[in-house]
Amino acid sequence: MSPATRFTVISCLVVSLITPSETSSWFDPFIEWARSSPNMTCVNNRTGTRSLATEGLISFNFYEASRTVRTYQVPKCIFMSSVSKTIMQGVDLFESLESYRRRYYSYIIVPVHASFQIFIHDLRTDLSSPTEELTSPVDKTLPNVTIWHTPSGYVIRLLDVVTPRFEECTLFPNHTVIFDMTVPCSQEVYLRQTGKHQFAIVLTFTPSFFVLNIQTAQHQHVTENDEDVILIFGDVRSIDVKAPYSKPVLTLRQSYRDDLLIVAKTSIVNATYPFIKTQDFLKGTLSGNYLDFNHVYTEFNRLVIHNLVEGLCDAPPDDRTVSMVFSYAVLARTLYHTSNVTARLEDVALRYVRLTLARTFLQQCFDVGPRYMRFPTIDGALSVLLKLIRNSRDVDGGLKLSLTFALIFGNNTDMTKERDLENALYEMKSIHRAGLVSPLSPRQRSLLYMMAYVTHHTTAFPDIRREMLAMQTSLCSPQELYNWAPHVSSAGLTMQEMFTPCSGSGRRDYSEARIAEIVQLNPLTTKTPADLYRILAHFDRSNLTNFPALSCISHLSGYVAVTLRDVTYVVSSNVMLKGTSYPVTNLAVDKTMIVTVSPAQHPCEKTEVAHATRSIPIVKNITIGNDCEYCKSAIMEYDEVNGLSNIVYLADTADLVLVTNLDNRILASSPRTRYIMMTANGTLMEITSVIIDIRQTSIFMIMLYCSLGVLLLYGLYRLLHMI
């Protein structure tokens, strides 16, 4: 029984002691007390001619008639604690019965206003505990955390790494329905501006439950007030409510393990959030095994797709928005609200990566990036796991990338090494080469999503990030948009599987009209150009601020940036930054295209005036030999009428052979199509053809070397037998 509950029982006993009989009639009581004393002997219903005041007791003296006083006493100490003071401050002894009744029904009473549901299902975690004996610790870098190596992988004790960083806070101060309480907590605030109105959803996590607070007031605030819609989910036994309310009448959903309480004014719910009263509210998350991380993550992604496709990220919170944030909160609570079992570190790490992916969407969907609940030990555990697998060729590159992504999201770039981004670059090159000739798979899109985040959200390792950005730009072709348009309508996709490299690239020139021109040719497309443009723009909310040579250019300027190792090319319709400008002359009269070249490490300087202008030389053909003089360069393809079409990055010789093979149809072939080579050293040239002269070892010589090797082995065999 909580302190507030115990005090309520005592208060009821006190009230029962001084309740008059039906025949009694008295005036208002006169209450007086003396200074503290160990005296605990009380009188009950004493009648006398004088009022009574006893040291250490509170005396209730009721004047019934002339010179007649009825006295009741209770110990003063029970009213002197902070809990009792708080409770007494929340009680209005002079409230009328009609006001009491109106106040009771002014809040949502679930049996009266809403649909209560109880979920009976088997709740169990999807984490499996290894059965091997833990005898081989491999790393003790983290304080109080041991990592063991077993045949099934690296193993840790769960609670050693998933405990969040909590700070003491006070919940529900001065609330009409709920008594305030001081608990360890962590808060996340999500803001959304729609027109003149600002909405906020505040998540407060505690060790036992979380609070989802939908703020309807015009000003944003961290603590809860009477105008908010409050949902409390988890173990709510420590929460106390004020009379005339009780937790059963506020319980909206229930399982054998957890309760969902709603505290909200009826008028606000009816006017703005009527979906809360329906049976389907939160059913997708709570009707299944919500301790199964994969189940909740799947439901979260289903809601994300609805919000993303239907443009709900720019609208006031509705059913799907609230349900999405609620499912995210369940994900976060599932991560840390667990028993201290052993688990594979890789499984725990992938859970954390998925939670991080969910956070990236919330960060994109709401206007202000919140301060997230931190898991300091799990960040350290991820860095240790990354250290253990960093140089292993037997570990999937996607796992290495996922760990790097999660660390950079948590501002832990110092826990990563250059080798980690080199591993990401290796994966990028593989996807880039495949993506030039075939549609990207959902897994490739998911990896590209994390690569794009890594590229844009750290300033470390600039040379590697510039090449990663160049390859994302290369993948953002009209053919990619043609393939992506029907892909976004596929069933069962996660948020990151809907990603297109166009959102993470240096191509900022695709307008809604241009997208319409491309996708209208694909009969499988079901989304409108407006829908596609909104999805594309949703993922594309960051400026290129972490690239010094591009940081001064407006996000909405309509340009293409090609970031080679030592030089930056910007293609636009007018001069945008200081550098050497190269006008493209072979265009229709109404088209203008300028290529501006600047050193990679040169700070961006915005200007609309060309400081140095040169013409682009025309080269009839270029020959590429074994030295690969044009590797780390790019080819720009443009149409004389329609302008820029494609940028193709040439990472190595294999890319050169692939791109220049006409059978692959990577570069268009038409009388109006022209090509400009953007070289790694900053030289521009218009080319008409490319000759590949990469000399390869002849088949005869290979056969000769193989024959000599066989003869040598046979000679060694005979020699050993003779000995």
UniProtKB/Swiss-Prot annotation:
Glycosylation sites: N39, N45, N144, N174, N270, N340, N411, N543, N621, N681
Family matches, as Pfam families: Herpes_glycoH_C, Herpes_glycop_H
GO cellular component terms attached to this protein's record: host cell endosome membrane; host cell plasma membrane; membrane; viral envelope; virion membrane
InterPro entries with a match to the protein in the record: Herpes_gH, Herpes_glycoH_C, Herpes_glycoH_C_sf
Transmembrane regions listed in the UniProt entry: 701-721
Record key words, sorted: Fusion of virus membrane with host cell membrane, Fusion of virus membrane with host membrane, Glycoprotein, Host cell membrane, Host endosome, Host membrane, Membrane, Sialic acid, Signal, Transmembrane, Transmembrane helix, Viral envelope protein, Viral penetration into host cytoplasm, Virion, Virus entry into host cell
Signal sequence region: 1-23
Post-translational modification: N-glycosylated, O-glycosylated, and sialylated.
Annotated stretches, region: Interaction with gL: 197-263
Subcellular location, record wording: Virion membrane; Host cell membrane; Host endosome membrane
A GO BP annotation: fusion of virus membrane with host plasma membrane
Membrane topology type: Single-pass type I membrane protein
Similarity-based family: Belongs to the herpesviridae glycoprotein H family.
Description of how the protein assembles with itself and partners: Interacts with glycoprotein L (gL); this interaction is necessary for the correct processing and cell surface expression of gH. The heterodimer gH/gL seems to interact with gB trimers during fusion.
Job description of the protein: The heterodimer glycoprotein H-glycoprotein L is required for the fusion of viral and plasma membranes leading to virus entry into the host cell. Following initial binding to host receptor, membrane fusion is mediated by the fusion machinery composed of gB and the heterodimer gH/gL. May also be involved in the fusion between the virion envelope and the outer nuclear membrane during virion morphogenesis.
Record protein name field: Envelope glycoprotein H
Primary gene name: gH
